[in-house]
Amino acid sequence: MSTEHTNTPRADSPQSAAEAVRGARQHAPAATPAESDPILELAEAMEGPLRIPAHTPEAVRDTVASLEKRLIGGQREFRRREVASEAGVSLHSARKLWRAIGFPELSDDEVFFTEADKKALGTMVGMVREGALTEETAISLMRSVGQMTDRMVVWQIEALVEDMIANQNLSDRQARRQLFSLLPEIIPAIEDLLLYSWRRQLNSAVHRMALRVETGVAAYNQDRGEDDGGTPLPLARAVGFADLVSYTSLSRRMNERTLAQLVQRFEAKCAEIISVGGGRLVKTIGDEVLYVAETPQAGAQIALSLSRELAKDELFPQTRGAVVWGRLLSRLGDIYGPTVNMAARLTSLAEPGTVLTDAITANTLRNDARFVLTAQEITAVRGFGDIQPYELSAGEGAGLVID
């Protein structure tokens, strides 16, 4: 991609935010002079990562400057070509890594990078040169870090702001201003927790990979009479969904804050139950959670516990779910394959308050007294033809114990 810039926009190129604001201002009476227009300043600040709107209070400016120096490892003193050159890579390769981690597009003359940025790029380039990683894998690793930490930071900031609003009687704007003063006090603790959690999660992943994957695949092959020769779907897992019924209509009747509380509570409750059951929360999509477990029994226990515990909470509407045991592919932190699709289809078929599974998973669970399997009507399912769903219910035993 060329690094040349031109001042003449293409006829089909989209307007920038600042250009759109200026265009709108030309056709409307300006309440304030253009040079002090806060909306225009905000639009320009969003396009230029080093700009702070002129009307920002000086105390906030000073705090932001102090926080930045602490967070990014020093003073910004390098341009992109200087950093790429010192790492011994082309600007094109460096930009691919920077984009993967979420850096904005920069011009050649913007002083944006610190010594820490040089070190980070040098580390990734060194791993590629030593043969530990391919360039494609390095980009994928950078993207995983960038996307996950971006979501994590937004989550943490909003949680802190919500806490200040609820417990300190502050407005949203006051809480966000106050957060500038709080962050320097809590950054070290959160940073330590991040590294601690990452190490713990990696350790759990190593155990799943090294100690249990073979057992899971062997159990799957035994159930289905297959072998492991050359399958493109190497992992055997129980895949489950839990879904809030009538979420769309419910969300229309709620104000934004109440809806946010509902979604946060749903995600937190599901994450707790899945963790207690030894599963892994793959992702949440508003009214739905997707999780995996390493055995069909663990997946079934989680599915039933989700149904039972969510039904106890008066804040939630009714829920429905499904769990299916089968092979899948794990990529980019997500999971793929017919097993995932089957679980999703069964979830959409389930009646409120019920959990469905497929015939093969039902057969696997049939001799376990903790579960009751009830055959349902044969149903045509898109992509699978006619299938025999089974309703999964609790049998003997207390199920998962949720404090």
From Swiss-Prot:
Mg(2+) binds at residues 243, 287. Pyruvate-stimulated. Keywords: ATP-binding, cAMP biosynthesis, Cytoplasm, Lyase, Magnesium, Metal-binding, Nucleotide-binding. CDD domains: CHD. GO terms for cellular component: cytoplasm. Belongs to the adenylyl cyclase class-3 family. Homodimer. It is an enzyme of class 4 (lyase). Residues 1-16 have a biased composition (Polar residues). This is Adenylate cyclase. It is found in: Cytoplasm. Binds 1 Mg(2+) ion per subunit.
